[in-house]
A protein has these predicted regions:
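...captures the hydrophobic TM-helix bundle architecture rather than a specific catalytic motif
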Residues: 1-307
């Protein structure tokens, strides 16, 4: 983001993309069969950092919503952040989390998609953005910002697919919503602004559903681990939480009736759309649905989501 020279930034992007893809292949090939399950040291510190960042994100979105008269976006951001802060300081400290990170075959496949395809898109974007502003001189060039958001997007996706801790997954989930908003609104035209806020509105609605689900699961079942959640016996309260998580997944993956935001995303530069479709947002929603599959079989929630 701080590098203003195109040539230097292009070298950094290429090297970063190569390292990301190489590490992705190494980790996946090395751990794909046996997997990894671990709890990170300093979990409370990480949680505190996440909380602070969530507050900053919420303030940014609320301010942007008010400034652009998209008040429902501000309301959604305020509600979900307030709910999560309340949960953090009232119930969360009572819940012990045994496994924060899980790398199994499913997350391994997702890591490959994010790391390899995402890196290829970043490499493609180097050449694409070189000529984009030549052909569209009416748009202000913000290439440092553009590439910074691309890599922020990939980082959030890695965190999302590797997190067994629902709080961490939720945080990464919301970072992807913010990233998509920033990329879709890149040109700052009226159409781009409207479509970026449409994407933010739908995905923040899903984020609010995600937050409510976390509160239900944490208070009722005293767990915040996705692996533990999927082993619980389906009952009404749990199925309500699962349904809310499915709503979040459907909004993120732009499934009917939440698909309109993805069409609007086409106003962004092509690498943005490629990333949204192939390696980030759409895949995130599908990933969560697959994770929840054990709780969807032979249940009313599963049938409803399928329909």
């Amino acid at each position: 983001y701080l590098v203003k020279s195109d040539s230097i930034r292009n070298v950094i992007v290429r090297i970063s993309a190569f390292i990301t893809a190489a590490l992705t292949l190494f980790v996946t090939l090395h751990y794909f069969q046996d997997g990894i399950a671990l709890s990170l040291p300093g979990e409370s510190v990480i949680d505190s950092v996440i909380t602070v960042i969530e507050i900053f994100i919420a303030v940014y979105i609320i301010t942007a919503g008010i400034k652009n008269k998209k008040y429902i976006v501000s309301v959604f951001a305020f509600l979900q952040t307030t709910l999560m802060l309340w949960f953090d300081y009232t119930y969360k400290h009572q819940i012990k989390i045994g496994t924060d990170i899980v790398f199994d075959k499913l997350s391994g496949i997702m890591v490959l998609i994010v790391g390899v395809i995402g890196s290829l898109i970043c490499l493609y974007a180097v050449g694409y953005m070189k000529w984009y502003h030549v052909q569209h001189s009416e748009y202000k060039a913000r290439k440092p910002f553009f590439f910074a958001v691309l890599f922020l997007f990939l980082s959030a996706m890695f965190g999302l697919v590797l997190s067994n801790n629902l709080i961490w997954m939720y945080f990464c989930w919301e970072v992807t919503s913010l990233s998509s908003y920033l990329l879709i609104g890149y040109t700052k035209t009226e159409e781009a602004k409207n479509n970026s806020f449409l994407a933010l509105f739908i995905n923040l609605g899903g984020g609010l559903a995600f937050a409510v689900a976390i509160v239900i699961i944490g208070i009722r079942y005293n767990t915040l681990e996705l692996s533990v959640l999927t082993q619980l016996k389906p009952e009404p309260a749990l199925l309500v939480a699962v349904f809310l998580l499915c709503i979040a997944a459907l909004t993120k993956s732009a499934q009917i009736p939440f698909s309109s935001w993805l069409l609007g995303a086409m106003v962004a530069p092509t690498p943005s759309s490629a990333l949204l479709h192939s390696a980030t947002m759409v895949k995130a929603g599908v990933y969560l649905l697959i994770r929840l599959a054990p709780l969807l079989g032979k249940t009313s929630v599963g049938r409803t989501v399928t329909i």
